[in-house]
Amino acid sequence: MYKFKTKPYKHQEKVFHQSKDERNFALFMEMGTGKTKVAIDTIGYLYQSKKIDAAFIIAPKGVYDNWVHKEIPQHLPDNIPSIVLRWQPNITQTYKKEFLDFIEASGHLKLFVMNIEALSTEKGSETAKWLFRKHPKSMMVVDESTTIKNRKAMRTRNVISLGQLCSYKRILTGSPVTKSPMDLFSQIGFLSDKLLGFTSYYAFQGRYAVVKRRTMGHRSFQEIAGYQRLDELNEKIEAFSSRVLKKDCLDLPDKIFVRRNVPLTDDQKKHYTEMKKLALTLFQDGMLSTTSSVLTQIMRLQQICCGFIKDDDDTIRSINSNRITELVDILNETSGKVIIWASFVHDITAIRDALAKEFGEQSVATYYGQTPQEERQQIVKNFQEDQTTRFFIGQPRTGGFGLTLTAASTVIYYSNSYDLEIRLQSEDRAHRIGQKNNVTYIDLVSPGTIDEKIINALRDKIDIAGQVLGESIESWIV
């Protein structure tokens, strides 16, 4: 009998027993309900049952490191001998040895973790294909499966092709339909084209979409005008999936904290290193002797993590960054209303523009220092009551105190304030009287940067402003 390493919540145990022996299954579990644990327990169970000897986990860049460093060590039982290999595109001598050790290991459950973006490259897809062929008794997990909703994308085609080499398959997402029920075709097609009964996308579209022909100028094309037979589609999906919402999970903690990694781009790394060197020089020259001067340097490092530099004359220069892309990916995985806190006005306007483009102008509201006083109450009212206003993008110094924003049960920190009180107050805009659900807090963090130091201090309830003087200055900058 399989013994859990970490005690599951009731909904996790139910889904585990419902799905553990299924060849193909979809875990449609809202963010914060613990779908990763269910997948890891399934891998462990199938290994102990001698049904698989390897697992291949495909996840977005901001998530796949969590599988390696947090989720697998936390949930995979200690009595299961395992070896974990994380994909990296740069093949060093050390990595070659790790790769060979992984291939040659026997008597171990092998777990290979790869970012989905790598499957858009020839090197990544060929490596994965070679590994999969070496391990036919395997399970493949696609975490945040909306990343393969585009049936024409190279990575989608590669994922579906790789899936045909595996014995067991799982897709994990909190929101399988981001814009259209047509999003389901390739996600479920990865599991098996027999599940929906269609091998042709156009046959699937013809059954569940209303398609009309439009003419613009001399060009004629078909356009989806609506959807049909969705009850039939839902009934089919229920046969091979579990849908779990936070509001139905009565034993979850009131507050759930999630971290999404956003690695720095090469451009950001260059500027970050230069800014660190400058800050260290100022420290060594005795020019960082006040709290405000140290916090200014911390803020400048933060700005680089967010994707911009503010020069001494207040000119703002954008830097190539993945942070907004990661934010949009998260929102595509999330259902319902969302609060997005950002410390810098430049980020608030950039986020607003990106979300308006992705989800529509009416879906976005902003609330920060420059928001006119006479508009503020209406903005909050619209967010609380109007279904079209889905995203509240705010500056925690302005909107983090006193407001009631309980229409959202997901809160994203695009960037964090170093002020503990501001963090705690901004958390409570959603988590207060009137909130009927557990609240999930998602922090965007660039690993190995000031982001990590700030979030660790805030989680430990440390007021950073009181900790950055004296000998500790250097540790904050480095």
Task: Walk through the language-model features, giving the residues of each.
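Conserved helix/coil segment N-terminal to the catalytic DExD/H
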Residues: 92-111, 117-136
